[in-house]
Regions:
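Glycine-rich phosphate/pyrophosphate-binding loops
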Residues: 133
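Active-site neighborhood of phospho(di)ester-bond hydrolases with catalytic His/Asp-centered motifs
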Residues: 104-106
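Generic structural hydrophobic/aromatic packing signal, biased to beta-strands
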Residues: 128-130, 172
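Short acidic/histidine-rich active-site segments
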Residues: 108-112, 130
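Extended, intrinsically disordered, low-complexity segments
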Residues: 144-204
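Alpha/beta enzyme core
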Residues: 1-102, 114-125, 136, 140-143, ...
């Protein structure tokens, strides 16, 4: 749940409410504190929207979120060509310590480059969002194949794009040390969640 544009108190209130519902259904929830802006606007340079470690400590305790997305110098979307954001790795470490080593997420990871992402993971980031990089990879591969063969069939092209993006994602999984971690995730009994008891609990 992204309540980062709300006031701090409202963010806590709304995130806590949603966390309570999610936990009744055996679901995890990610909250967001500090605003991850838009790359095209240059928002990544605005340190005033970075996550404050003391705020993060209180937010984590009062909301009960399972993961916290923080703002440390990245932004959503595609950066201008040649621009690589400056990530505040020390802030990551400070938030990690303040929240008692809880899982933390980095939004706007696209365009940050291998070195930045690896340093962020080393500093304590557990999850990286980078859908823009995935979409750009698909776009550029599509452009390349259409230049090579303008008459390529649409279905064949999409199948090629899918295989190409799989390789792109697999590379990032390996690079960040995420490979072989599926056993850490537990399946949710969705049949059990549909019992009347759970439905009543949701409405309380």
């Amino acid at each position: 749940f992204d309540g980062s544009l709300l006031s701090f108190e409202e963010n806590i209130k709304e995130t806590k409410k949603i966390a309570s519902i999610c936990h009744q259904f055996g679901m995890g929830i990610e909250g967001e504190l500090g605003h991850v802006g838009i790359a095209a606007n240059g928002d990544e340079k605005d340190e005033s929207i970075y996550t404050d470690p003391l705020d993060a400590e209180r937010f984590a305790k009062e909301t009960g979120v399972d993961c916290l997305a923080i703002a440390v110098g990245t932004a959503h979307g595609e950066y201008p060509k040649g621009l690589i954001p400056h990530i505040n790795f020390q802030r990551i470490r400070e938030v990690k310590e303040a929240t008692n080593n809880m899982p933390i997420a980095l939004h706007g990871g696209s365009g940050s480059g291998d070195e930045n992402i690896l340093k962020a993971v080393e500093a304590g980031i557990n999850k990286v969002n980078m859908v823009t990089d995935v979409l750009v990879s698909m776009r550029e591969y599509t452009r390349k194949r259409l230049e090579e063969n303008p008459k390529i069939g649409y279905i064949n092209l999409m199948m090629e794009v899918e295989e190409n993006v799989k390789s792109f994602i697999e590379r990032w999984i390996d690079l960040t040390g995420s490979c072989g971690k599926a056993a850490l995730f537990k399946p949710v009994d969705r049949v059990g969640l549909l019992t009347p008891k759970c439905a009543i609990g949701l409405g309380e």
